[in-house]
């Protein structure tokens, strides 16, 4: 899929590990952000509706042929049922742990659901990588990252990343390997290069 945009003109933050959330002027009013648009409304606004089977990998490229995003698809076999299994498992674990809209981990700027983080971060002013694991939910997070269906999702994402963005992947891998060779830090999914994972338990 080719889009009429130049990736070199995208907004970018200066920090090496800082996200750039976008300008407020581009995000619209509170009502704009909360509105649920229909497909017809989005098309009228200039969006293009692209049919996709959800399985076949499709790269999205800018006007110079640079890959800027990928619809990574999914592997063949029982992957779809495993995704549903992982979803149900996460829902049950969240419910059994008392997580919901009214819990302290509840609604936040990303949605009306609790989010738990596990892994390693270098943010929040830390001079070196530190663990993200919340002490009160360690057992829950250990069960989540240990679940076979969740592990398969992580490994597929890891493989897709390495296939479609090999140079960035190699940089991630080098940092990952260096960090874990020097520091005793948790690793969510052995064999993958992602430092952290966010579990949306809504």
What annotation goes with each model-predicted range?
Residues 1-201:
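Fe(II)/2-oxoglutarate oxygenase catalytic core
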């Amino acid at each position: 899929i080719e889009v009429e945009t130049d990736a070199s003109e995208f907004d970018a933050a200066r920090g090496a590990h800082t996200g750039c959330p976008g300008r407020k002027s581009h995000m619209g009013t509170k009502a704009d952000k909360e509105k649920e648009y229909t497909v017809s409304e989005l098309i009228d606004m200039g969006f293009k509706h692209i049919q996709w089977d959800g399985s076949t990998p499709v790269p999205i490229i800018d006007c110079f042929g640079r890959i800027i995003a990928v619809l990574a698809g999914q592997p063949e076999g029982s992957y779809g049922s495993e995704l549903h299994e992982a979803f149900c498992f996460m829902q049950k674990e969240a419910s059994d742990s008392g997580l919901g809209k009214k819990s302290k981990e509840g609604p936040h700027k990303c949605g009306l659901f609790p989010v738990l983080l596990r892994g390693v971060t270098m943010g929040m002013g830390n001079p070196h990588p530190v663990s993200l694991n919340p002490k009160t939910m360690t057992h829950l997070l250990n069960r989540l990252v240990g679940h076979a269906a969740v592990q398969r999702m992580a490994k597929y994402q890891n493989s897709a990343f390495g296939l479609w963005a090999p140079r960035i992947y190699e940089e991630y891998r080098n940092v990952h390997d260096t960090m874990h060779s020097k520091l005793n830090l948790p690793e969510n999914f052995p064999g993958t290069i992602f430092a952290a994972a966010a579990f949306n338990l809504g």
